[in-house]
Amino acid sequence: MAKTYKRRRYYRSKGRWSANIKNIDDSQTLTGPTNTTVGNSVDLCLNPLQDSLTVSQTYTVKNIELSTFMETENNAYVEDIEHYIMYVPQGMNLTTEYNYEHPEYIMAYYFQGNPATDNTSPGYRLKLKTRMARRLQTGDRIIYFWKAKKELSSDIDVKIRGLVRWWTKAN
């Protein structure tokens, strides 16, 4: 008679992904001479630094979808607009050249070129998404980073409004 063996199967539980959404409402006054490169960043998702009051846990971020509207005031406009979703490790300094200094951290990008046809009510719509995933350690963050060329010598007020959605899973 043949011997039978009973095998035990072990199952590993899958991580559960949760959806997150955030409202973006940011404004900045751009100063400087004509043909200056200006830019700004908005934190999309952030893993805070761990201190004596908070405990930070590493987690994975994926499927980031960004929908924004950029509006300039003072009858002014900006040209050669570059949009990025970028990863920023803890302690990294942000400059207007961050995308060229660390191209390995670019998750998604879009070049808008010269969108201004008239400067009475310039507004720039943008939808940007990435399926790339990043594991965020303590102090890391994902940002929406934009930069543009300032065409006028006067100050320009820029407002960015929109929504961002992403998925997270604890590691």
Indicate residue ranges for each PLM-predicted region.
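Capsid-like jelly-roll
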Residues: 2-171
